[in-house]
C-alpha cells in the first residue's frame, strides 16, 4: 500500500464495513470488492467484514455467496448470522448437485440451531433430480440430528431394501431421544423382518407402555406377539384395545383371527359387544364382523340375528354370501352337528366320523372362507369325513412345516401321512381356501393324496404380490421382501404339480375375479389339474358361494365316492 492509498484507507474495520456497504448500495460492485479485499488483508477475521463478503459475492453469484455463508457456520460466533443470510438466498435454482451437497454437508456439520437449520435443509432438499435428492437425504438424515430427516432417510433405506441401514438410523435416533411413536412402528417392522422378533417386541412393549392410547402400537404389538406364539400376552394387549376402542370394526375383524383361548375369547367378545352399543345397528362393517365373532362363540342364534338385516355395498360383497350360506342350516343345527370345539391356539385339531368315507386335511388360517371352523366341521361331519385341521403360526404357508408335527416340511408330511392312515377312510383329500388352497395343493401332492382342492388359492405366492406398492408403511411390502429373502422356499405350485402323480388337483376360482383367474390359469395344461371357474363370483371367497348354493356339499359327496 503506497502513501496515497494509506491516506484513503479505512482506519478501522467499522469504517471499512461502512465503506463497502455504501459502495454496494451505489452499485459499485467492483470498487466494493477492492475495498473489501484491502480491508480483509488488514483484518482477516473481523466478523462484519467476513459476513459482508457474502453480500459482495451475491452480486455476481448467489451460489458462491451461499457457499461462503455455509463455510462460516462452523464458527459458533458467526453461525447464526451466516445461516440467516444463507437462508435469505434460497432457493438456488442454478446450484449444481455437487454444490447443493456441499452446502448440505456444511450446514449439517455447522453450529446452526434447528429453527434456522430446518428451513435451509428443506429448501436444499427441493433442489435437483431424484439422485441428488437421495444424496441430500442421506446427508441430512445422518448428520442433522433432526428426526424429520432421519425419518426420511430410514424410509428411503427401507424402500431400497437396506433394512440394516434403516435400523441403524432409527436406533441412533432412539438412543438420542428423538424417535417418534410413528417411526417406532416402522422400526419394529424392520427388526421383525431382520430375524430380530424379540427385539421388535421389546421395543413395542416399551413404547406401548408410554403410549397406551396409540392404536397402531397396540395392533403391531399384538401381531408380533402372535408371531412369537405368546398368545396369552397378545390376548392381554388385545383386550386392552377392545376396552379403549369397542366400536372399531377392525378390532372385531382381528378378533375373528386372533389365536386366543376360548374362555378369554368369550370375555373379550362380551366386552366388545357391550361397548359397541348402538353402533351395531348403524355401522354395517361392525355388525358383520360382530356377527362372525358371535358365531365363533357359543351363541349362534344371536349371530344369526346380527346377520339378518340387509347389508349394502361394499359390506354386502362379503356379507351376502355368508347370509346365504348360513341359511342352508338353522342356527342350532350348525352347532349341534359340529364335532369341533375350536381352540385357536392349537396348530392341529382332529375330528372323527364313526365310519369314515375318508380323511380331509384342511390347511387353514383361523377360518375357512368367512365361516367359523366349527360350522365348517358340521358340513364335513354330515358327509362322514374325518378332518385334520391345521394352522401355520409361522406364517410360511406350511413350507417350513407345522411346529408341533415336525421341524421341517418333510417331517410334517410324514406325521400327517401316519395320522391319516390311523384315522382311516378310503380316500385322502387335502383342501384349503385362499393361501390355504396353495398349501393344500402342495401338502396333498407331497402326501400322495387322492384329491387336492384349492378354493380361490394362489398358485405363485410371490407373483400374487407383484403389484405391491413399495412403501415403508405398506405391510405387504414387508411380506414381499421377506418372501424374496426366502427365495429357497418353493412359492410356486407349478413344479410340484407337474411331477408324475396319481393325485387329482381341483382349482376352484371366481370366474369374475381377475387376480384369482390369473393365478388359476398358471396351472393350465398341467396333467391331473382341473380348473373350475365358478360363474357369477367376483370375489376371493368362492367357498362361501359354494356352501350357499349347495355345490360344496355336492363336491364332498363326489369326493367321498
What kind of region is each of these model predictions?
Residues 10-11, 44, 77, 111-112, ...:
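Short coil turns that delineate tetratricopeptide repeat
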Residues 15, 49, 82, 116-117, ...:
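TPR alpha-solenoid repeat register
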Residues 26, 59-60, 93-94, 127, ...:
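Structural motif corresponding to the intra-repeat A-B loop/turn of tetratricopeptide repeats
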Residues 32, 65, 99-100, 132-133, ...:
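Single-residue signature of alpha-solenoid repeat helices
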Residues 334-385, 392-396:
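Short, surface-exposed "cap/lid" segments of acyl-processing enzymes
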Residues 471-533, 539-544, 550-560:
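The feature captures the conserved acid-bearing segment of alpha/beta-hydrolase catalytic domains
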Amino acid at each position: 500500500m503506497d502513501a496515497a492509498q494509506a491516506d484513503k484507507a479505512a482506519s478501522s474495520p467499522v469504517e471499512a464495513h461502512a465503506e463497502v456497504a455504501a459502495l454496494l448500495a451505489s452499485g459499485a460492485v467492483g470498487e466494493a470488492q477492492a475495498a473489501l479485499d484491502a480491508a480483509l488483508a488488514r483484518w482477516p477475521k473481523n466478523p462484519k467484514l467476513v459476513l459482508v463478503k457474502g453480500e459482495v459475492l451475491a452480486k455476481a453469484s448467489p451460489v458462491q455467496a451461499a457457499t461462503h455463508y455455509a463455510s462460516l457456520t462452523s464458527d459458533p460466533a458467526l453461525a447464526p448470522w451466516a445461516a440467516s443470510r444463507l437462508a435469505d438466498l434460497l432457493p438456488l435454482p442454478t446450484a449444481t448437485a455437487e454444490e447443493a451437497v456441499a452446502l448440505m454437508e456444511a450446514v449439517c456439520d455447522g453450529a446452526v440451531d434447528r429453527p434456522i437449520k430446518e428451513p435451509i435443509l428443506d429448501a436444499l432438499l427441493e433442489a435437483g433430480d431424484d439422485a441428488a435428492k437421495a444424496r441430500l437425504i442421506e446427508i441430512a438424515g445422518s448428520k442433522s440430528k433432526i428426526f424429520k430427516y432421519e425419518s426420511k432417510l430410514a424410509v428411503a433405506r427401507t424402500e431400497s431394501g437396506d433394512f440394516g441401514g434403516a435400523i441403524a438410523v432409527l436406533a441412533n435416533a432412539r438412543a438420542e431421544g428423538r424417535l417418534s411413536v410413528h417411526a417406532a412402528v416402522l422400526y419394529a417392522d424392520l427388526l421383525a423382518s431382520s430375524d430380530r422378533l424379540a427385539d421388535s417386541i421389546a421395543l413395542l412393549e416399551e413404547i406401548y407402555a408410554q403410549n397406551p392410547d396409540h392404536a397402531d402400537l397396540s395392533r403391531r404389538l399384538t401381531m408380533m406377539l402372535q408371531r412369537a406364539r405368546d398368545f396369552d400376552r397378545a390376548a392381554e394387549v388385545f383386550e386392552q384395545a377392545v376396552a379403549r376402542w369397542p366400536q372399531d370394526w377392525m378390532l372385531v375383524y382381528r378378533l375373528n383371527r386372533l389365536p386366543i383361548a376360548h374362555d378369554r375369547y368369550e370375555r373379550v367378545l362380551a366386552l366388545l359387544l357391550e361397548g359397541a352399543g348402538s353402533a351395531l345397528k348403524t355401522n354395517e362393517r361392525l355388525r358383520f364382523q360382530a356377527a362372525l365373532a358371535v358365531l365363533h362363540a357359543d351363541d349362534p342364534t344371536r349371530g344369526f340375528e346380527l346377520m339378518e338385516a340387509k347389508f349394502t355395498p361394499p359390506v354386502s360383497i362379503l356379507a351376502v354370501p355368508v347370509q346365504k350360506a348360513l341359511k342352508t342350516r338353522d342356527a342350532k343345527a350348525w352347532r349341534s352337528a359340529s364335532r369341533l370345539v375350536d381352540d385357536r391356539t392349537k396348530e392341529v385339531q382332529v375330528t372323527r366320523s364313526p365310519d369314515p368315507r375318508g380323511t380331509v386335511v384342511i390347511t387353514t388360517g383361523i377360518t375357512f372362507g368367512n365361516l367359523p371352523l366349527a360350522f365348517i366341521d358340521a358340513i364335513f361331519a354330515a358327509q362322514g369325513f374325518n378332518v385334520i385341521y391345521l394352522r401355520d403360526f409361522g406364517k410360511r404357508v406350511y413350507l417350513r412345516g407345522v411346529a408341533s408335527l415336525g421341524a421341517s416340511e418333510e417331517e410334517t408330511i410324514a406325521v400327517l401321512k401316519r395320522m391319516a392312515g390311523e384315522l382311516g377312510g378310503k380316500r385322502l383329500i387335502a383342501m384349503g381356501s385362499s393361501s390355504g388352497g396353495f398349501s393344500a395343493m402342495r401338502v396333498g401332492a407331497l402326501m400322495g393324496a387322492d384329491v387336492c382342492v384349492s378354493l380361490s388359492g394362489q398358485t405363485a405366492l410371490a407373483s400374487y404380490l407383484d403389484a405391491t406398492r413399495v412403501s415403508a408403511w405398506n405391510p405387504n411390502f414387508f411380506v414381499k421382501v421377506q418372501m424374496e429373502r426366502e427365495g429357497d422356499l418353493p412359492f410356486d405350485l407349478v413344479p410340484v404339480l407337474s411331477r408324475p402323480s396319481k393325485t387329482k388337483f381341483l382349482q376352484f376360482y371366481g370366474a369374475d375375479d381377475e387376480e384369482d383367474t390369473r393365478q388359476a390359469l398358471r396351472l393350465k395344461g398341467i396333467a391331473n389339474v382341473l380348473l373350475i371357474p365358478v360363474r357369477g363370483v367376483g370375489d376371493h371367497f368362492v367357498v362361501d358361494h359354494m356352501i350357499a348354493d349347495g355345490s360344496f356339499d355336492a363336491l364332498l359327496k363326489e369326493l367321498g365316492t
